[in-house]
Amino acid sequence: MGNDVSATVGHDSSTNDLQGVQTFVYPTKDELFRKVYVGEWVDGKRHGKGTLEWRNGAVYQGQWDSDTLCGIGSFHLPTSGVQYEGEFLDNQFHGAGVLTWKDNGRQYNGSWHEGKHHGYGTLKYDNNDSRQRIFYKGEWKHGKRHGYGIMKWRSGAQYEGNWTRGQRDGSGKQTFCNGDIHVGKWKGASRHGPGCRYLINGDKMFGTWKNDKKHGLFEYRYAHGRVEARLYVDGKLSPEPIAQGMNHVSQKRTIH
């Protein structure tokens, strides 16, 4: 706004008469919370383009609508290294925007709704994330991973599939750090329901998982062609194979 800023600076509690481009210093008994607005006013309300700066260094610069953050803008809080650039509505992140934590490298780039991740977006996790996650890219609902998305870990593991309220849930494909792949059903972040484990050595096993454990009758198909049945109970294998030479079992497997 530069030279267009009025020379008049307000210090009292009333902004009723402010019009056009003005500077207003908000009164406070605590200097720590002092804030200054420089920008456009309409009928005593911040409206148009303007900058609000707090004593602690926090700054909002962008569009206003009747005293609320609304439209395109940026918010920077230097004490914590947080910076947001994007759309606002009713003083909240709303629409498309990027939120960055500069101190640890965390960043969300995508859609927002009332201050929460909502829609499609990519979250890059902290450099020192305790769960060793690198990123999640996909759908969100009210701040949680929800819908279809991909998550990757530093170990090389990756999950691609459905999520519900932040957890793997429904149909999905998990690639493990050793190269094995599991395709099947998930519930509450655990393998639960029909699935197939593709081992890196070429072997395959088809069956049902319960609470992340193999449970029930499995078909184990070796890479060289031999097929046998195996019985698991809560992840524990029966001592002996149930049968060998199960060539009559269809090799076609479809997991919905």
Over which residues does each language-model region extend?
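Intrinsically disordered, low-complexity repeat tracts enriched in Gly/Pro/Ser/Thr and acidic residues
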Residues: 1-256
